[in-house]
UniProtKB/Swiss-Prot annotation:
Intervals holding LRR repeats: 21-44, 45-68, 70-91, 92-114, 116-137, 138-159, 160-183, 185-206, 207-228, 230-251, 252-274, 275-297, 299-320, 321-343, 345-366, 367-389, 392-415
Function: Required for normal synaptic spine architecture and function. Necessary for DISC1 and GRM5 localization to postsynaptic density complexes and for both N-methyl D-aspartate receptor-dependent and metabotropic glutamate receptor-dependent long term depression.
Keywords: Cytoplasm, Leucine-rich repeat, Methylation, Phosphoprotein, Repeat, Synapse
Species this chain originates from: Bos taurus (Bovine)
Name this polypeptide is given: Leucine-rich repeat-containing protein 7
Biased composition (Polar residues): 676-706, 792-803, 1331-1353
Stated family: Belongs to the LAP (LRR and PDZ) protein family.
Quaternary structure, from the entry: Interacts with CNKSR2 and DLG4. Interacts with CTNND2/Catenin delta-2. Forms a complex with N-cadherin through CTNND2. Interacts with CAMK2A.
Modified-residue entries (Phosphoserine), positions: 438, 440, 442, 849, 868, 946, 948, 1117, 1232, 1334, 1438
GO MF term list: protein kinase binding
Entry-annotated residues carrying Phosphothreonine: 830, 864
Organism lineage string: Eukaryota, Metazoa, Chordata, Craniata, Vertebrata
GO biological process, any: positive regulation of neuron projection development
Length: 1536
């Protein structure tokens, strides 16, 4: 209501001289936070006519108010009135009374004295009855009593004869008084949401009734209603009506007829007599046929008959010439009548989920058609006449589609030889059949029971290496988190449908699934699984090779193997063993991941290598890789089928390494560990792909880097091909040609996938392997192809597709790819260059599911990359083209993994590089946490298309095998330019993590890093040239580094490879960044980051690349957060200065943290501006989404998340962990992230703090693990245990805890913050990556990792989910806030990213606040404070309910999309009445802040202006005065 002022007075020349006063008739005190009626009102009691007191906190009306005899309108809605005083009777002239939204329980009897009342608005009050006096208000024309407690109306209600509008919605009325027939003037009657079981008899007597709402009641028949000749609008939806009378034609004036959600089996022919009908909705009924007379509705504009059982449409539908909207979704239509072409005014037509096998040519006549949804049908192609639809703006062929319009190409029909239109999404594979199958076929009761018993403990028997090699693919873990925990059923191999049933947790499908045959010719099933995220939750994909990693991932891609690596508590002995295992994994190329298909892995390696040199055609090699897992086709299918199974429980089951000789079992145990971690990661990430991906990723991380690289290369080619996944993987594709096609999402889709390259992948020996790195769909997708050898089709396709779009295939891909990779990761390691496989889990880290969109499933991505021609790949490749210059062209990015398995696993393996068995450490703590959020999202189907893989990313766990020695060295060589030899060198476990660098750009960075695929050379301990690149990615020179230094080879992605991707893949496809307008990840990671000194940069670049899991670890990266964390911990803190890190583009932030692995790496990252700051590492993202009980995906979610919930992508809600995870679980989740954070270089992770004293050149120190790193690590762990409260809730970890001391908690926090802050510059460009849930997780994880630069295992201790004490939190509060903000924002944006520019609007740049917020203790104390490390996962922070602070960037469109309350002079807030701060009270669902803010958020700053002690009005004006971009620092109470 607008404030009105009437000035009544004599027109005097100058009233001011005459002393005349204005006569006030209208006063408006709305929204003034008043607790009582202002006394000024009474000064005008004689003249006051209108008084507005809306939205205050008035509890009672003073008697004086009723002396205002002239008052005609009294408006007091939204206050705290509990009653109306009887003195209201004195307002005899009152005409309008509005008391809605109060606590008024009844009207006083004497309200009858207000004879002039014409309008009463009393909705939303606990009014249980109306007094008899109420019926004496004879002048009443409008009465609104919605949402009250009325059970009946007064018997003489009919006396209100002048009533025109009567709204009684949402009450408890069961009948109407008979006197109602006297309401002759009643035109609108709303009785919706009441308890009518039959239509009141009096209704047919209200002849003038024009609008009638009777929805949401229990009506079964509609007698008499057809007698209302004047009726224009009739809503009878949501009742139990079974039949409609022939008399319906009596309502001859009817224009809108809504009969949705009833039990109608047919419509009467007389419906054709409703000549004026413009809207007819009969959706959600049981109609089997439509009457032919429907063609007589010549004025019909909207017709909705979705969700029925129609098997045909009447040909008379062609007479509906006025029709504009036609919805026939979810029916059983095998074809459309040719006459439909006559409906030439139709602009929107949806035919989703039918059985259409072909479309009539006549559709080409529907010239005005703008939106056409054909998803989930059985179309093999489109008629050539589609080329005539010039106005077509959206053509939906798949639920996983990332772009509204996907290019079509002309082909000749194989049978008729006619020209038809097709693309990679054809032929369609309906998910329905698959879904139906998965419930029964893929459900294994025995497996379910076994898993249920073991859900909380995953025991991996690590036998001798031989056994490990043989069984690497098998998940020995017998128990996983029960699927029910994830709301999933353990559907073993074919959860094609898994419609949200309780799937076993990732279906302990590991072994069983592996052993279970996966229908090779089950593309539909796989597709169904993938396509239905809802299914994917329940799906438990078998992870043949990924068994080691326990097929948790198969579950939903979220829970994958999350717990596999969870150690109840990382006791010193355990840590040592774990480290040894990791080292062994790193040191032993193929034993660790060897699976039943280990031989195939070897083949894959060779094949991959060949692929590396070939282009897409090499796909068969990828297939081989897939074969190594199980049957490539089967695996793929399985992966596809059980993507949802990948979901891991928020708190993954704990893994217990049964092997006593961890070193011996390192091969298997390490691999298994890796698998476990990675699986967890991938499952968390994949969500859709989880079964195979997570498993495969985890188990098969071993996939050869070579194959990964090959995949990446292929991916480039594939992307070039666009959607030729089938071509890429002819063999596996055969099994799932449709899937592959589907998977090959349009280029538009690709970027989404690219958003989330598995960091692990990149990390894996093929940091250079663009494909790995490109988890996001870039090279990583190619890598997925390699993983595809598990399910070649699935993998390569899935990756690509997943990158691209959300093809259902993607889901499948994801599921399958990872397990293989994990399994074969070890094999892949076989080649020296392929040493990286040692970190198999990295690969599995994330295979993006269609929804996840390359969340964090490197293996999936990797598999897809080589073979999949998804546009996404192209996009990544293009971006990588920009990167190529920085990469040394020397080593093309041949896939170093010889094993076909290598796919993503390989990438991880490369990253693992097995630098030194003794030194390799597996950090899993974070990855598990990440995974869980992602899984959570998957579970809740939070992933949005946009979220796709990216969002899902956070669900995966990444484990990096980082030899402690390599910490420093690995760090050095892990730089973006990570030396091939380093990466490949067994001692370069960290090298294998090089992908961490690319993480930020999972897409193009993968390419870039892929080119630095040094891993092939990795084993050679020769001097390598490390190339430095300027920000433009132009090589500035090569620095020769000795192998011992473990400087990662310059990104040896062959510039050719990288370039190829760049050329082949549209930038949009190449990288989510590019897609969203963000600078390519590669650019973001450009080595030009000046902050790192050139030399250090060179080393750092290489070291960073390999060493920083973070790099790889973009939110999308598959590498487990912990691994990345470890890598980064080793190198990043020392090598990068906080400023450097921050200097990097936002993507880099997360990666940076992971990059902390080595100084050189971090420097490189800085230089790149990508690794750390550019986007959060996958871990970070994951940490955000996963670590924090953030509600990912949704809102990401999505994330996407998705969806990841927008709540706080990085917030603790990501993982709905109600109970704190055990220390082991925490460690397992956090280590990788923590490790990243721990990298000595990261002290400046709180980069703004610039605490990181280690100079850029410190990279060496970063790269090298302190001699006593183990002790330090153990101390850190112990300290963390003791000081968990000391750690920041967020990823801010006292860096001091880390052995590198130099990296203090600040560093870790900074890492988180960095992502946000750095992002502020590049927000739009780079945030997308971070926005992916996985990235977000990475950020969180990374922050933690950065925080504790000490031992690799430090992350475990740090990884605890304990929330640091408030004091610490406050110290790093700002920092944390920014981190959190960035995480949550990133997470959201991630969700949004794949499909929308949301990323832009929510750029999670860490305002300077994150950096500024130093963690003094963390900075000051580096080594000694492990206990303090913020290693607590970001997810943890919310667990304790600590308020988290975030940085949120909102782009006005046109407004900010949220409402605030509170302030010094405000009316308070409903969240914390005692807090006078500014709180967000409402967020517009689809507005700019929808994914960023949530009610209850406290605004601390806006564009630098403090909102802590600000008046409400000033805050409103300030927010309105800002231009387009508003950067907020908010505080959110995060609770799990």
């Amino acid at each position: 209501m607008t404030t009105k002022r009437k000035i009544i007075g004599r027109l005097v020349p100058c009233r001011c001289f005459r002393g005349e006063e204005e006569i006030i008739s209208v006063l408006d005190y709305s929204h003034c936070s008043l607790q009582q009626v202002p006394k000024e009102v009474f000064n005008f009691e004689r003249t006051l006519e209108e008084l507005y007191l809306d939205a205050n906190q008035i509890e009672e009306l003073p008697k004086q108010l009723f002396n205002c005899q002239a008052l005609k309108k009294l408006s007091i809605p939204d206050n705290d009135l509990s009653n109306l005083p009887t003195t209201i009777a004195s307002l005899v002239n009152l005409k309008e009374l509005d008391i809605s939204k109060n606590g008024v329980q009844e009207f006083p009897e004497n309200i009858k004295c207000c004879k002039c009342l014409t309008i009463i608005e009393a909705s939303v009050n606990p009014i249980s009855k109306l007094p008899d006096g109420f019926t004496q208000l004879l002048n009443l024309t409008q009465l609104y009593l919605n949402d009250a407690f009325l059970e009946f109306l007064p018997a003489n209600f009919g006396r209100l004869a002048k009533l025109r509008i009567l709204e009684l919605r949402e009450n408890h009325l069961k009948t109407l008084p008979k006197s109602m027939h006297k309401l002759a003037q009643l035109e609108r009657l709303d009785l919706g949401n009441n308890e009518f079981s039959e239509l009141p008899e009096v209704l047919d007597q209200i002849q003038n009734l024009r609008e009638l709402w009777m929805d949401n009641n229990a009506l079964q028949v509609l007698p008499g209603v057809w007698k209302l000749k004047m009726l224009v609008y009739l809503d009878m939806s949501k009742n139990r009506i079974e039949t409609v009378d022939m008399d319906i034609s009596g309502c001859e004036a009817l224009e809108d007829l809504l009969l949705s959600s009833n039990m109608l089996q047919q419509l009467p022919d007389s419906i054709g007599l409703l000549k004026k009908l413009t809207t007819l909705k009969v959706d959600d009924n049981q109609l089997t046929i439509l009457p032919n007379t429907i063609g007589n509705l010549s004025l019909l504009e909207e017709f909705d008959c979705s969700c029925n059982e129609l098997e045909s449409l009447p040909s008379t539908i062609g007479y509906l010439h006025s029709l504009r909207t036609l919805a026939v979704d979810e029916n059983f239509l095998p074809e459309l009548p040719r006459e439909i072409g006559s409906c030439k005014n139709v602009t929107v037509m949806s035919l989703r989920s039918n059985k259409l096998e072909f479309l009539p040519e006549e559709i080409g006549q529907m010239q005005k058609l703008r939106v056409l949804n054909l998803s989930d049908n059985r179309l093999k192609n489109l008629p050539f006449s589609f080329t005539k639809l010039k106005e077509l703006a959206a053509l939906w062929l798949s639920d996983n589609q990332s772009k509204a319009l996907i290019p079509l190409q002309t082909e000749a029909h194989p049978e008729t030889k006619q020209r038809v239109l097709t693309n990679y999404m054809f032929p369609q594979q309906p998910r329905g059949d698959e879904d139906f199958q998965s419930d029964s076929d893929s459900f294994n009761p025995t497996l379910w029971e076994e898993q249920r018993q073991q859900r909380m403990t995953v025991a991996f028997e690590f036998e001798e290496k031989k056994e490990d090699d043989e069984n690497a693919g098998k998940v020995k873990d017998h128990s996983c988190q029960a699927p029910w925990e994830r709301g999933q059923r353990g559907i073993t191999l074919q959860p094609a449908r898994l419609s949200g049933d309780c799937c076993t947790p990732w279906a302990r499908c590991d072994q069983q699934i592996q052993e279970m045959p996966v229908p090779q010719n089950d593309p539909q099933l796989a597709w169904g699984c993938i396509s239905g995220l809802q299914q994917e939750r329940s799906m438990c994909t078998p992870l043949p090779v990924a068994a080691q990693s326990t097929t948790l991932p198969s579950l939903s891609g979220r829970q994958v193997e999350i717990n596999l690596k969870r150690y109840p508590t990382p006791y010193p002995e355990d840590l040592k063993n774990m480290v040894k295992s990791v080292q062994n994994l790193v040191g032993k190329p193929s034993h660790g991941v060897r699976v039943e298909n280990s031989n195939p892995t070897a083949n894959t390696e060779q094949t991959v290598k060949e692929k590396y040199e070939h282009k897409w055609p090499v796909a068969p090699k990828e297939i081989t890789v897939e074969d190594s897992f199980v049957h490539p086709a089967n695996e793929m299918r399985i992966g596809e089928l059980h993507p949802s199974l990948a979901e891991t429980p928020l708190y993954p089951p704990k893994l217990v390494l049964l092997g006593k000789d961890k070193k011996e079992s390192t091969d298997e145990s390490e691999v298994d560990k890796t698998h476990c971690l990675n699986n967890s990661v991938s499952s968390g990430t994949y969500s859709d792909y989880s079964p195979s991906q997570a498993s495969s990723g985890s188990s098969n991380t071993r996939v050869k880097v070579g194959s990964l690289q090959t995949t990446a290369k292929d991916a480039v080619h594939n992307s070039l091909w666009g959607n030729r996944i089938a071509q890429s993987f002819p063999q596996p594709l055969d099994a799932k040609p449709l899937l592959s096609q589907r998977e090959a999402v349009p280029t538009g889709n690709l970027p989404q996938r690219p958003d989330r390259l598995p960091i692990s992948d990149a990390f894996t020996d093929n940091w250079t392997d663009g494909s790995h790195y490109d988890n996001t769909g870039f090279v990583a997708e190619e890598t997925t192809g390699e993983n595809a050898n598990n399910n070649p089709l699935l993998s390569s396709k899935a990756r690509s597709t997943s990158s691209h779009g959300r093809r259902p295939l993607i889901r499948q891909d994801r599921i399958v790819g990872v397990p293989l990779e994990l399994e074969q990761s070890t094999h892949r390691h076989t080649p020296e260059t392929e040493v990286p496989p040692s970190n198999p889990w990295q690969n599995w880290t994330r295979t993006p599911s269609p929804f996840e969109d390359r969340t964090a499933f490197p293996s999936k991505l990797e598999t897809t990359p080589t073979t999949s021609p998804l546009p996404e790949r192209k996009e990544h490749i293009k971006e990588s083209t920009e990167i190529p210059s920085p990469f040394s062209p020397g080593v093309p990015w041949e896939y170093h993994d010889s094993n076909p398995n290598r796919s993503l696993s390989n990438v991880f393996s490369q990253i693992h590089c097995r630098p030194d068995s003794s030194k390799g450490v597996i950090s899993i703590s974070k990855s598990t946490e990440r995974l869980s959020p992602l899984m959570k999202d998957i579970k809740s189907n939070k992933f949005k298309k946009s979220q796709s893989i990216d969002e899902i990313d956070i669900g995966t766990y990444k484990v990096y095998n980082i030899p402690l020695e390599n910490y420093a060295t690995g760090s050095d060589h892990l730089g973006s330019h990570e030396r091939p030899d380093k990466m490949l060198g067994p001692e370069h476990g960290m090298s294998s993590m090089s992908r961490s660098q690319s993480v930020p750009m999972l897409d193009d960075e993968m390419l870039t890093y892929g080119s630095s695929k040094g891993p092939q050379q990795q084993k050679a301990s020769m001097t390598k040239k490390v190339y430095q690149f300027d920000q433009s990615f132009n090589p500035q020179g090569a620095v020769e580094v000795k192998a011992e230094k473990r400087i990662p080879p310059p990104f040896q992605h062959n510039s050719e490879y990288v370039q190829q991707p760049g050329k082949n893949i549209a930038k949009d496809l190449v990288s989510p960044r590019a897609y969203r307008g963000y600078p390519p990840v590669e650019q973001m990671f450009s080595f030009s980051q000046p902050s790192v000194n050139e030399d250090a940069v060179v080393n750092a670049q290489f070291a960073s690349q390999g060493a920083r899991a973070g790099f790889l670890r973009r939110a999308d990266s598959l590498a487990s957060s912990t691994e990345m964390a470890m890598f980064r911990r080793v190198s990043e803190p020392h090598e990068l200065t906080p400023s450097d890190r921050y200097g990097r583009p936002p993507y880099r932030g997360g990666l940076d943290r992971q990059s902390s692995v080595s100084v050189t790496e971090s420097q490189f990252l800085k230089r790149n501006g990508r690794y750390e700051d550019e986007h959060p590492s996958y871990q970070e993202v994951k940490a955000q989404a996963g670590s924090f009980p953030v509600k990912n995906l949704t809102q990401r979610r999505p994330l996407s998340a998705r969806s990841y919930s927008t709540e706080s992508y990085g917030a603790s809600q990501t993982r709905p962990v109600s109970a704190r995870p055990t220390m082991a679980a925490l460690l397992e989740k956090i280590p990788s992230d923590y490790n990243l954070g721990n990298y000595g270089d990261k002290p400046s992770d709180n980069s703004d703090i610039k605490t990181r004293p280690t100079p850029v050149k410190g990279e060496e120190s970063c790269g090298k693990m302190p001699a006593d790193w183990r002790q330090q690590l153990l101390r850190h762990i112990e300290a963390r245990r003791l000081d968990r409260n000391a750690a920041y809730k967020h990823n801010t970890v006292n860096l001091g805890m880390l052995p590198y001391g130099g990296i203090s908690a600040m560093h870790a926090g900074r890492s988180m913050t960095l992502n946000l802050q750095t992002k502020s510059k590049f927000d739009l460009q780079e945030l997308p990556l971070q926005k992916t849930p996985s990235q977000q997780s990475n950020i969180l994880d990374n922050g933690q990792e950065d925080v504790s630069p000490s031992g690799q295992w430090n992350p475990y201790p740090l990884g605890r989910r304990d929330v640091p004490p408030d004091t610490i939190t406050k110290k790093a509060g700002s920092h944390i806030q920014t981190l959190m903000g960035s995480q949550s924002l990133q997470h959201r944006s991630r969700e949004q990213q794949p499909y929308e520019g949301n990323v832009n609007k929510v750029t999670i740049q860490q305002f300077q606040s994150p950096l500024p917020i130093q963690i003094p203790s963390s900075q000051a104390t580096r080594g000694p404070q492990p206990g303090r490390c913020l290693i607590q996962t970001k997810g943890q922070r919310s667990m304790d309910g600590y308020p988290e602070q975030f940085c949120v960037r909102i782009e006005k469109n046109p407004g900010l999309g949220f409402s605030i309350s509170g302030g010094i002079s405000g009316q308070g807030n409903p969240f914390k009445p005692s807090d006078k701060g500014i709180f967000v009270t409402r967020v517009q669902p689809d507005g700019p802040a929808s994914n960023l803010l949530q009610p209850g958020d406290k605004i601390l700053q806006a564009n630098g202006h403090s909102f802590v002690h600000m008046e409400h009005e000033k805050a409103v004006l300030l927010l309105k005065s800002f231009q387009n971009t508003v950067d907020l620092v908010i505080q959110r109470e995060l609770t799990v």
